[in-house]
Amino acid sequence: MSLEILDQLEGKIKQAVETIQLLQLEVEELKEKNQQAQQANDELRSENEQLKGEHNNWQERLRSLLGQIDNV
């Protein structure tokens, strides 16, 4: 192989390594964002369950009050 071909090959390898490094950084950033999104999702699910419980409690109280009104 000539020196020129080896230089071209070296340049392409360096470029490929740089691309791989950039992609690895991007993957790490996306993993962090995914983890943050998962945590936010878990928090929202927990809040949703709490609100459903409160809603059910209010419905029971309302039924009880309506039952008392019917008895009057």
Curated annotation (Swiss-Prot):
Q: What does this protein do?
A: Non-essential, abundant cell division factor that is required for proper Z-ring formation. It is recruited early to the divisome by direct interaction with FtsZ, stimulating Z-ring assembly and thereby promoting cell division earlier in the cell cycle. Its recruitment to the Z-ring requires functional FtsA or ZipA.
Family the entry assigns: Belongs to the ZapB family.
Listed HAMAP family:
ZapB
Q: Which residues form a coiled coil?
A: 2-72
Chain intervals with Basic and acidic residues compositional bias: 42-57
Its recorded name reads Cell division protein ZapB
Subunit comment: Homodimer. The ends of the coiled-coil dimer bind to each other, forming polymers. Interacts with FtsZ.
Localization: Cytoplasm
Identify one Gene Ontology CC term for this UniProt entry: cytoplasm
Check the UniProt entry and state the signal peptide residues, or none.
none
- Single GO BP term: FtsZ-dependent cytokinesis
What is the gene called?
A: zapB
Q: What InterPro entries does UniProt report for this protein, alphabetically? A: Cell_div_ZapB
Top-level taxon of the source organism:
Bacteria
